[in-house]
Amino acid sequence: MASIEAVHAREILDSRGNPTVEVEVALDDGTIARAAVPSGASTGQFEAVELRDGGDRYGGKGVEKAVAAVNEEISEQIVGYEAEEQRLVDSALITLDGTPDKSRLGANAILGVSLAVAKAAAESADLPLFRYLGGPNAHVLPVPMMNILNGGAHADTNVDIQEFMIAPIGAESFREALRWGAEVYHSLKAVLKAHGLATGVGDEGGFAPNLDSNRAALDLISEAITKAGFTLGQDIALALDVAATEFYADGAYQFEGSSRSAEEMAAYYTELVESYPLVSIEDPLSEEDWAGWKALTESLGDRLQLVGDDLFVTNPERLQRGIDEGAANSLLVKVNQIGTLSETLDAVSLAQRNRYTAMISHRSGETEDTTIADIAVATNSGQIKTGAPARSERVAKYNQLLRIEEELDDAAVYAGANAFPRFARQG
């Protein structure tokens, strides 16, 4: 067993040009591993706190305080721990911080250390990270939920819904699914050009045109799927991240130019489900609208996946409330929302034990770190959301999944339509 010999953090840049934390952990057997922390654009108010410096430097977004926390206080605390004792390390980090939201040391400091320790332990054990975390049964390759058209907080456009995604549910392998997604992505670019629309991209690599409505986005993507030679609803399905908290105020939703109630939003989603092969809608309602979530789950929860992101913030306590109240039926998993690997895995386990699906997710501010790809396979979650098949910080995760599928060889199983048990394939 190798123990932690040194911990070092530095400030690096993420995909939006903002600072983030990277941590290196060295073990006494010579192993060195590093992890970099992502950052979100649309963030839930119940997320663990990202420590930023304030002031003029980097527009107040510097992370020198978080870096100092790692290099001083955290390093002093965890040097000497066995790297394979992940839960002990994470527990020590949580105790050292001493706040319920990790606001003293910063979730960005704590998470960087937590992930780097796991990666070092895996390397020391001569195991790929997915195998180290998931054991011998880790074998399911996730459906890539590709955000190919951006709106909301991820793009400077007049489209309310934040993400329009494609899900290659009919592919036979992850490799094939990735190809299908890339082909539709390029088809969509051609479709947008043919309609005289802009083909600039948003934070996550998806196109970000100004459109007349949210339905127009779904129509364009449907056209792109068909023109790429695929069957809509059988080969490739659709999914949304509404990020409704972003346009919720004073008990109402400011959507498509009007103020709407939760009931009116539910009626709108029902119309969409009737019109398009939607397998998943993420954050259809606000993180504070528990009554609306419960009613929506009762009306649509047997037809598609209703994913809690801002609602749950990868927090087992909030997820348990959702389970108890019948709100949502799926968990979005973002490691930096909760701040340690152990708590992340606990949230996934709680979801799966209660027949909630789990979708492993990136953030809009990403790095070349590929840890979430391994987590997706380790947990057999069957779904990953990590952007369009463009921009290297997104593609890095997809390429890592290609490597994992190749390593698993005949043991690899692509989740495909089985990832969405509530959806009846069309076509």
Swiss-Prot record:
Q: Which organism encodes this protein?
A: Thermobifida fusca (strain YX)
Question: What processes in GO biological process is this protein linked to?
Answer: glycolytic process
Q: Name the EC number(s).
A: 4.2.1.11
So what family is this one in?
Answer: Belongs to the enolase family.
Keywords annotated in UniProt: Cytoplasm, Glycolysis, Lyase, Magnesium, Metal-binding, Secreted
What is the annotated role of this protein in its UniProt record?
A: Catalyzes the reversible conversion of 2-phosphoglycerate (2-PG) into phosphoenolpyruvate (PEP). It is essential for the degradation of carbohydrates via glycolysis.
| One Gene Ontology molecular-function label | magnesium ion binding
Q: Where does this protein chiefly localize?
A: cytoplasm
Query: Active-site residues?
Result: 204 (proton donor), 334 (proton acceptor)
Q: Where in the cell is it found?
A: Cytoplasm; Secreted; Cell surface
Which positions does UniProt annotate for (2R)-2-phosphoglycerate binding?
A: 162, 334, 363-364, 385
Q: In which pathway does it act?
A: Carbohydrate degradation; glycolysis; pyruvate from D-glyceraldehyde 3-phosphate: step 4/5
Task: Name the needed cofactors.
Answer: Mg(2+)
The record's listing under Gene3D superfamilies reads: Enolase-like C-terminal domain, Enolase-like, N-terminal domain
Q: Where does Mg(2+) bind?
A: 241, 282, 309
Q: How is the cofactor bound?
A: Binds a second Mg(2+) ion via substrate during catalysis.
- An example Gene Ontology CC term for this record: extracellular region
Taxonomy of the source species: Bacteria, Bacillati, Actinomycetota, Actinomycetes, Streptosporangiales
What's the protein called, per UniProt? Enolase
